[in-house]
Amino acid sequence: FNVKGLEIASKSRIKNYYVKYSNKRNFENRVLKLLNKNKIDLICLAGFMKILSKKFIKKFSSPIINIHPSLLPKYKGLNTHMKAIKNKDKYSGATVHIVNDKLDSGKIIIQEKVRILKSDNEKTLKKKVLKIEHKIYSKAIIKLLTNY
């Protein structure tokens, strides 16, 4: 499926599933069944470019977390690097937050910032932010599981 996370999970002998997206309702119902069947108590989203329904979030009673490539609440949604460059921001960064029923608006678990240089463009900024995303996601999970 060309999904790096699934490749790593398979090589590490971690149970994993690929759920084909046909439509939102079917997808979410199939995912919820798998989560319940396997007694999953934390969902970590990364590069998941879909918005979960209020119903899904409510039905999955454990935390759902997401990593976002901006210093939320600034630049929710897409094109975060372009917006930061266009607005001549001095800093950008990454945020791990709890998913709620509003886009990129849940409680912030952890953030880290990077300096935006005059020489930066979308591509170089994306690379810098991705580097800290990899660093802070595991920290956020530990923080969440140890109740901060």
Regions found by a protein language model. Give the residues of each.
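One-carbon transfer enzymes
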Residues: F1-Y148
